[in-house]
Amino acid sequence: MNDLLLWSLLLLTVTTVLLVLPFYPAWSEWRRPRDRQAQAVDPPAALDTGPRALQLAPGACFNTVHARHLMLGSGAMPAPSVQPTLQRWQPPAGARPWGLHGWHIGHHLDIPANQLVPCSLVVRGRLRALGPGRIEGDIKARDSLHLGPGTKLQGNLFCEGDIWLDAGCSVSGLVMAEGSLHLAPGVVIGTPQHPVSVCADVMDVRGPVLVHGSVQARIRGSVACA
């Protein structure tokens, strides 16, 4: 019995030593630290967060493309046109307030040229802005949406049908069409500081068109040949 107890104590001692021994350096450093300060550790290499440029040449077909600087088509982007003096747009009769700074239009809406629209618009029909002009807010149209040449939209663009953006148009926010999206030369969507998404069933691009962000053609997208 005594021998069994002795061997048990010996086995327990050896096991305890083997378990504690790996922690001795840490315990010794804790009791009498030799490092006066924490050792510097080299930081991991920073990720490349800079803009990534990509160009789709005329004749290219695509579905989903991501890039901070996406050029669709070839040739130089035309210089931004100088907008004329704009007149403050007035909502038509029957328009209802929508949100904090918007209007709900229950029928088709045509916006004349040289207009400043300082609000968001919800149109239960077709919307057409003749351009040039500036719209400071989001736009949502049910049937179709057409921005004429030189129209600047500071907001997002939504349509349950087709969208046309004529030459020189710019949209600072995202663009979403449940139908087709037609982009004319000189169109700019998004900004380098604020990449956005462009989405439609079908995209018809006549470049050069510049998009900051991503484009998604659910069925097909194509860049027309020059």
Task: For the regions a language model picked out, list residue spans one by one.
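N-terminal signal-anchor transmembrane alpha helix of single-pass membrane proteins
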Residues: 1-29
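Extended beta-solenoid/beta-helix repeat architectures
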Residues: 23-226
